[in-house]
Amino acid sequence: MKIKALSKLKPEEGIWLTEVEKPEMGHNDLLIRIKKTAICGTDVHIYNWDEWSQKTIPVPMVVGHEYVGEVVGIGQEVRGFEIGDRVSGEGHITCGHCRNCRGGRTHLCRNTTGVGVNRTGAFSEYLVIPAFNAFKIPAGISDDLASIFDPFGNAVHTALSFDLVGEDVLITGAGPIGIMAAAVAKHVGARHVVITDVNEYRLDLAKKMGVTRAVNVMNEKLEDVMSELGMTEGFDVGLEMSGNPSAFNSMLTNMNHGGKISLLGIPPSDMTVDWNQVIFKGLVIKGIYGREMFETWYKMASLIQSGLDLTPIITHHYKIDDFQAGFDMMRSGMSGKVILDWE
């Protein structure tokens, strides 16, 4: 049976709507009928066919990894799922036999493969994933929100790596993940949450999500904002979401002694860092990759159930046949999360 899918067909800029064979599930898998997908920054990299994509993405391949769907098939060894369950899923498929997997630190598996990156993705009418990777969506959480659990999980993992209660938090990079991390920080009790960027659209979006201050670093100095907020000792926690070298070095300059930094943004490999700031301030820096399996997922659901409102981050919806408009919107930088509807 042929089904619709968005695929990377050629080693050049673009993504194409095509027909592929419906995937077949194994004994430990679920077959999921996709309802909604969201476009990730990774998908934009794949669309643009940048240096990372050229080294990483096999062609041809169905792409996409942010989704919500309904279980329509269950492998014979699978327990705990029923036909009709609403699910999203962890996009990192882990090996199960390395030291970290066996030690319960699955998110640190050295043999990870990625849905829509190294194996068939979710931009399709149907997806097969290991049942281990599926996460049931509680009633009361909308399909829209469920479809962005993957990037929301990046935000939650980054933000909750350190204690935020009563702390002053600096977030560099107001993309959708940075903005969601800011919302999480406010929700769990941070004092001042300051986010920086140069994109006014995204900074306005951050204001709607409740940040203390959204700072365009082209127009304002971070030091002036700190003074305005009555901060005298620097930020306690930094969440680096941009991958921008000047943003990261500005963060180092403005951290308090003993401050803690989570790094999610991917900088150039040759980025220059003022290590004196790290050493003499006694800073702690933690690299973040993906989501903790599955502690982050349970936290995500609980945060929404406890009143965290992420709906402003979803700014655009398109039918799947209009996928090109969705990608154009994401590439413009004038959007939050963009959702593609498969129904």
UniProtKB/Swiss-Prot annotation:
Keywords assigned by UniProt, alphabetized: Cytoplasm, Metal-binding, NAD, Oxidoreductase, Zinc
Coiled coil (residue ranges): none
GO CC terms of this entry: cytoplasm
One of the GO BP terms on file: L-threonine catabolic process to glycine
SUPFAM superfamilies listed in its UniProt record: GroES-like (SSF50129), NAD(P)-binding Rossmann-fold domains (SSF51735)
EC number in record: 1.1.1.103
InterPro entries xref list: ADH-like_C, ADH-like_N, ADH_Zn_CS, GroES-like_sf, L-Threonine_3-DHase, NAD(P)-bd_dom_sf, PKS_ER, Zn_alcohol_dh
Positions annotated to bind Zn(2+) 1: C40, H65, E66
Cofactor binding notes: Binds 2 Zn(2+) ions per subunit.
Binding of NAD(+), residues: I177, D197, R202, L264, G265, I266, I288, Y289
Gene3D superfamilies reported in the protein's UniProt record: Medium-chain alcohol dehydrogenases, catalytic domain, NAD(P)-binding Rossmann-like Domain
Annotated compartments: Cytoplasm
SMART domains: PKS_ER
GO molecular function: L-threonine 3-dehydrogenase activity; zinc ion binding
PROSITE patterns linked: ADH_ZINC
Pathway: Amino-acid degradation; L-threonine degradation via oxydo-reductase pathway; glycine from L-threonine: step 1/2
Binding site for Zn(2+) 2: C95, C98, C101, C109
Entry keyword annotation includes Cell membrane: no
Residue numbers annotated as active site: T42, H45
Cited function: Catalyzes the NAD(+)-dependent oxidation of L-threonine to 2-amino-3-ketobutyrate.
Family affiliation: Belongs to the zinc-containing alcohol dehydrogenase family.
Quaternary assembly: Homotetramer.
HAMAP family assigned to the protein according to its UniProt record, in alphabetical order: Thr_dehydrog (MF_00627)
Protein known as: L-threonine 3-dehydrogenase
Gene giving rise to this polypeptide: tdh
